[in-house]
């Protein structure tokens, strides 16, 4: 789904603290899915909230995500660690796999699906 088809923003950029995560519901290929959003400065990256290891959600409670001392997103179920640059699993049971990216666009201080 493109931003033109979904004019409603997912979340305001300022609602995500710098270096923090947020959860948003997105529609991908016609399915409503949970996504994890990560803000770094003025950029926001997004991935589906699904670990490639066992298909479980990454958050330990709805919208609550773990970040390691090394600065990786950590799956609460089995401890897989994912790079916040590209979503690649850098440690854990699915090393070498990657999270499914969600294309985002920032406009007027809001985050939209791209």
Regions found by a protein language model. Give the residues of each.
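N-terminal pre-ligand scaffold of iron-sulfur
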Residues: 1-68, 83-84, 98-114
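Short beta-strand His + acidic residue motifs that chelate non-heme Fe in jelly-roll/DSBH
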Residues: 82-83, 91
């Amino acid at each position: 789904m493109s931003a033109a088809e979904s004019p409603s923003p997912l979340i305001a950029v300022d609602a995500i603290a710098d270096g923090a995560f947020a959860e948003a519901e997105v529609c991908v290929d016609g399915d409503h899915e949970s996504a994890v959003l990560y803000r770094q400065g003025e950029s926001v990256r997004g991935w589906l909230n699904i670990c490639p290891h066992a298909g479980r959600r990454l958050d330990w409670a709805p919208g609550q995500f773990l970040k390691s001392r090394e600065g990786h997103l950590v799956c609460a179920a089995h401890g897989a660690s994912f790079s916040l640059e590209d979503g690649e699993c850098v440690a854990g049971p699915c090393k070498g796999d990657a999270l499914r990216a969600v294309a985002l666009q920032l406009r007027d201080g809001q985050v939209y699906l791209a």
